[in-house]
Amino acid sequence: MVGPNVVFDVMPRVGAPVQIGLIETMRARDGRVPWLGGHLARLKASLAALGAPEPPGDLADLVRFAVGTGDRVVRLQLTDGHPEIATRDVSAEQAVHVVVASEVHKPYPHKTTRREQFGRALTDARRVGAHDAVLVSAEGFVAEGTAWNLFWWEDGSLCTPAEDIGILPGLGRKRVMEMTDVKEARVPVAALAGRSLFLTNAVRGIVEIGVFEGAPVPRDPRTAELSFAFWPD
């Protein structure tokens, strides 16, 4: 089994300039990475869209080697065709306290290392005692969390910010949309008041928001049902 916090620098380079990288963050469960093919397909699509070089080896084999047999968070970064894999422990799931970021959301269609807007939003959220933040577009529409996609229940329907706002369509978001009907919407922050909210990503699955902008968030039993079914057998 691979150690608790390991970095594999698969193809070391000496004196290489710092460049933008593409990243995929995955969850290993009992040594298996759900949606590994989806992660690598998204990575390949971003490589093509950005005109970046592909790695010379099989990334799937590298990820499996890094995972070992346990439950891990796996971060794959690819810069100029050079892969690096890091693993860490899985944090405990809990309802989170989320605030609205003052940082204006800029379109983020590819999962790259250019994540400064999310870093600033997360730092500001932690400064006021929150776990995370939701960013809002320049047009005033709720966009996404710092490493999550957002969902909410509204009049019997499950909703999520529309992809054309410029969000990263995460694999956790895709999984939820495979499990149930979801309405993509463009809404202001005020539209979330009193709604039951949750976040998703491919590492922690579904995590309920317990407090939003200082107000308790009502729970919806349908969220627990989705959470139970989220991870494939």
Language-model regions: role of each:
Residues V142-E163:
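Glycine- and Gly-Pro-enriched alpha-helical subdomains that act as flexible
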Residues M1-V134, A138-F141, D164-I167, R173-D233:
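Conserved alpha/beta cores of soluble small-molecule-handling proteins
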